[in-house]
Every structure is written in structure tokens, then in C-alpha cells.
């Protein structure tokens, strides 16, 4: 599979998974994973960004992603990025930060960056505080290549 084909598959999956979902401002949720993916500088970052919320926010599974041709190293990264409802947010962030998985750390940084931008634009103070704190925690692990 070519890089372009993989990106197209990820885009199709994300679009189907988030169909009909709206964010806090009433905009289609798909705009967020698209923005996160487009911050990526390589195919793995783009695909992971597009798919980073799919399992957490839909009925899709990691097995389904593998069946669709998403490479196992990306699916493993998505497992790491998926926040279990039984896990505190701090534990979740620590798990990503200390994983040594650069793709997960970069994608989470992009996710937080876009969430922070949306929070500021929408005047969502609680979200801005949460995402600022999370970026402050993650910053030492994210060394901008």
C-alpha cells in the first residue's frame, strides 16, 4: 500500500467513525482529527492524527483498523493514545509521556495544540486550563525533533 492510499484509508475511517458527532461549539468533530493529522510531517503522523480518537469515540476497534490495513505500529500507537474511562487523565498523560513512543508523543502534542486553540477560540476556560497543564507536563518529552 502506498502512503497516499494509507492516508486515504485513514481519512475514510475517521470520517465514518465521527459522522454526526458535534464538538462543544456545535461543529463536526471530524474537523479536530483532520487538524491533528494535518499537523503531521510524515505519513505515520498524518494517519495517527486522523485516527487518534476513532476507537475512543466510536464503536470501531483496533482489530477493525488492522483489518482495514492500518499498520500494526500505528495501531499500537493508537492503543497508547486511547484514554480508558477507568484511567485518570494524569495517569493517561504519564503513560504516553514515558512510553518512549515518539509517534504517540508527537500526536498527543498536536492533539493538545489543536484542543488548546479550540478552547481559546470558544472561550472554554476549563478546557484551556486542562490542555495548557497537559502541554506543560508533556513539553519535556516533546523535543520538536
Task: Please give the residue ranges for each predicted region.
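Active-site helical microenvironments for divalent-metal-assisted chemistry
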Residues: 1-145
Amino acid at each position: 500500500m502506498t502512503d497516499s492510499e494509507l492516508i486515504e484509508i485513514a481519512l475514510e475511517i475517521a470520517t465514518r467513525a465521527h459522522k454526526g458527532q458535534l464538538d462543544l461549539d456545535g461543529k463536526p468533530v471530524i474537523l479536530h482529527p483532520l487538524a491533528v493529522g494535518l499537523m503531521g510531517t510524515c505519513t505515520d503522523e498524518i494517519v495517527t492524527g486522523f485516527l487518534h480518537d476513532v476507537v475512543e469515540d466510536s464503536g470501531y476497534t483496533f482489530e477493525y483498523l488492522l483489518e482495514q490495513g492500518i499498520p500494526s505500529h500505528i495501531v499500537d500507537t493508537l492503543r497508547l493514545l486511547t484514554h480508558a474511562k477507568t484511567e485518570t487523565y494524569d495517569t493517561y498523560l504519564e503513560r504516553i509521556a514515558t512510553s518512549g513512543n515518539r509517534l504517540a508523543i508527537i500526536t498527543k502534542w498536536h492533539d493538545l495544540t489543536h484542543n488548546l486553540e479550540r478552547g481559546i477560540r470558544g472561550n472554554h476556560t476549563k478546557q484551556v486550563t486542562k490542555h495548557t497543564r497537559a502541554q506543560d507536563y508533556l513539553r519535556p518529552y516533546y523535543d520538536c525533533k
